């Protein structure tokens, strides 16, 4: 039944997947079955632009084992978990963690899977919740050993360590550790998530942006091969950003953006449709393919329609941030500085959604 639900999810039959999972969550008895159903629900609600519902499911899952978390933890909550990382690390070098034994306890492995799946919707929902989840993933790895989810966790703590904890140097080392685990220990299940997170959010701040772009391309390929729906979509969005930053041909960037939009539509992934729609609009207007240079409106995209969608659905706040950023860029290059400033102010109020 879980396999059928996953197939329904991958083929964008989201209503059927939701109904099946709601039935299965009532029937699941073992820790493993509960974790599998929960993980699929988290993927489903992320795809459905229901990060709030995903967080509710996650917190309910935690409560089953007697753990109570707030959906809006404080910075102090996060700092306690972050400091626990360094207590557990002790005198070891970050690079030495690549040699930790692999986790064999099925309970811990299932727990890591659920925590890994909640990271994305948690980031959309509350920045402190996302930080707390990532820190817990790392502490679980330090306590029990490495697994597929550890690769992703180490890269995400790299993303948080600098902006949120003012520890950029060690953050980058953790990011490299995550990638090394994929490549040297064969922990490839979350390869796409690890590569896109490092390539788009860690590497560009330490190396030339093109090195990150190439890693994001590998993430796209890996996501398709392993059927990682969520990060196949996110990787495509990030690839367009990286290609723009690398100065690639706008014709090539447009192809990448249109491929991402088509993927979002095929999978009914509303968040990605909004991300990619704005990317396509920006590239088209930069190429002079829209009726008015600097305006993303054409026969296939409407800025007004996008803004109405965002006004109706606060779960699309991350996509709205990207929209206003793309609109800012479009207006700036057209010399419409008043409209660019207006777009920048709208983007600024949503800056918290952009990640660490």
Language model regions located:
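Alpha-solenoid helical repeat scaffolds
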Residues: 22, 52, 56-59, 135-138, ...
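Amphipathic helix-loop-helix modules that constitute alpha-helical solenoid scaffolds
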Residues: 46-132, 244-326, 330-335, 352-356
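Residue register of alpha-helical TPR repeats
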Residues: 36-39, 113, 152-153, 193-195, ...
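Residue at a conserved register position within TPR or TPR-like alpha-solenoid repeats
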Residues: 8, 38-45, 121-122, 154, ...
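TPR/TPR-like alpha-solenoid signature
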Residues: 2, 39, 116, 135, ...
């Amino acid at each position: 039944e879980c396999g059928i639900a996953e197939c329904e999810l991958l083929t964008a039959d989201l209503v059927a997947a939701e109904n099946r999972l709601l039935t299965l969550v009532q029937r699941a008895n073992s820790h493993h079955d509960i974790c599998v159903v929960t993980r699929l629900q988290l993927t489903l609600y992320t795809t459905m632009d229901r990060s709030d519902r995903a967080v509710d499911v996650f917190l309910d899952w935690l409560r089953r084992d007697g753990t109570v978390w707030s959906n809006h933890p404080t910075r102090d909550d996060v700092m306690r978990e972050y400091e626990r990382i360094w207590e557990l690390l002790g005198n070891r070098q970050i690079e030495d963690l690549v040699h930790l034994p692999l986790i064999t306890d099925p309970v811990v492995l299932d727990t890591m899977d659920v925590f890994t799946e909640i990271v994305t919707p948690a980031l959309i929902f509350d920045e402190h919740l996302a930080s707390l989840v990532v820190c817990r993933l790392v502490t679980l790895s330090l306590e029990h050993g490495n697994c597929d989810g550890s690769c992703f966790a180490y890269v995400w703590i790299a993303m948080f360590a600098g902006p949120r904890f003012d520890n950029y140097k060690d953050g980058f080392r953790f990011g490299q550790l995550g990638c090394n685990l994929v490549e040297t220990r064969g922990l490839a299940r979350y390869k796409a998530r690890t590569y896109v997170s490092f390539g788009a959010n860690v590497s560009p701040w330490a190396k030339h942006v093109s090195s990150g772009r190439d890693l994001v391309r590998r993430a796209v390929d890996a996501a398709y091969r392993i059927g990682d729906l969520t990060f196949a979509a996110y990787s495509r969005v990030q690839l367009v950003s990286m290609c723009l930053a690398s100065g690639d041909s706008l014709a090539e960037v447009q192809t990448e953006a249109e491929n991402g939009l088509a993927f979002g539509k095929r999978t009914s992934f509303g968040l990605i449709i909004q991300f990619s729609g704005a990317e396509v609009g920006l590239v088209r207007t930069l190429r002079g393919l829209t009726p008015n240079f600097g305006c993303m409106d054409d026969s296939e995209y409407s800025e007004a329609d996008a803004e109405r969608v965002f006004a109706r659905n606060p779960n699309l706040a991350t996509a709205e941030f990207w929209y206003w950023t793309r609109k800012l860029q479009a207006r700036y290059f057209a010399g419409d500085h008043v409209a660019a400033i207006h777009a920048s102010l709208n983007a600024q109020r949503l800056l918290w959604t952009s990640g660490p």
